[in-house]
Amino acid sequence: MATKLQDGNTPCLAATPSEPRPTVLVFDSGVGGLSVYDEIRHLLPDLHYIYAFDNVAFPYGEKSEAFIVERVVAIVTAVQERYPLALAVVACNTASTVSLPALREKFDFPVVGVVPAIKPAARLTANGIVGLLATRGTVKRSYTHELIARFANECQIEMLGSAEMVELAEAKLHGEDVSLDALKRILRPWLRMKEPPDTVVLGCTHFPLLQEELLQVLPEGTRLVDSGAAIARRTAWLLEHEAPDAKSADANIAFCMAMTPEAEQLLPVLQRYGFETLEKLAVLG
C-alpha cells in the first residue's frame, strides 16, 4: 500500500491491520529520538510505535524551561487523545531534564526520560577523563551537574555544549554530508588537550546519528556512550509490569507539528524506520 502524507484533518489510512500491540510514543524536538527508538525497536519489535517530533519549536536546547514543559505536555496530550498510550519515551535530553515531573503527574501511563549516560561512562573510563557532549541547555542545567556529583565525582568531566551538532545530525538524516571540519572545530577544545577524554557521553539523542563521523575525528580508541540501550531495557520492564492495556492494530505512524517541505523530505527516512505515514498533529496552545 502506498504511504501517504497526511494533514491533521485527514483520516489516516492504515496499512493492513495486524494484531493489537501496546502503543508506545517516542517524542523528540527533532529526529534525534530516532536513535533511541531504534534501540527500543531492536529489543521490542512487535509494538505499535508512534514517533512525534516538534519541528515548530525545534531545537529545544535554547528554549526556556517553562516553554518546554508546556509544549511537551501539550504534544503528549494531543497524541494520547488520538491513540491511548501504554508508555511514552521523551527521547530528548533537554526535555527530559525539565518535563518529566509534569508528565508523570498528568498521565497514568509510564513516562521514560533520557539522561546523559554519565554513570556508565565513569565506570568505563581508563584515564579518568570523561567528555560530555550535549546541548548548551543540558550542559548548564543543575540536573546534569547533580548527575556528575553523584556518579562521577572522582572523574575529570570536560563538557562541550553545541547546538550546531544537532543541526548537523538533522542535515545528515536529510541526506546531506557531515562536515568533518565542522566537527573538528566543535571538538577543538578536546582535540587540543594533552590528555583528552577517553570516554565521551553523547548527551543529546541526535548525537548517536553522528557516531561514525565522531569516531573519525576523536582520538583513536575513544569510547562513545549513550543511553539508548538502557532506555530500551527500562521500556521493556515497564511495559511488562506497570503499563496500562492500551493497544492498537494500526500501522506505525509519525507526527510532525507542521507539514513543511523539510518535514515531507523526511518521509523516506521515516519509512526506513518503519513508519507508514507522516501526519500533522493538531496541538492546542
Curated annotation (Swiss-Prot):
It catalyses: L-glutamate = D-glutamate. It is an enzyme of class 5 (isomerase). Keywords: Cell shape, Cell wall biogenesis/degradation, Isomerase, Peptidoglycan synthesis. One of its GO terms (molecular function) is glutamate racemase activity. GO terms for biological process: cell wall organization; peptidoglycan biosynthetic process; regulation of cell shape. PROSITE patterns: ASP_GLU_RACEMASE_1, ASP_GLU_RACEMASE_2. Substrate binds at D28, S29, Y60, G61, N93, T94, T205, H206. The active site is at C92 (proton donor/acceptor), C204 (proton donor/acceptor). Pathway: Cell wall biogenesis; peptidoglycan biosynthesis. Provides the (R)-glutamate required for cell wall biosynthesis. Belongs to the aspartate/glutamate racemases family. This is Glutamate racemase. It comes from Escherichia coli O157:H7.
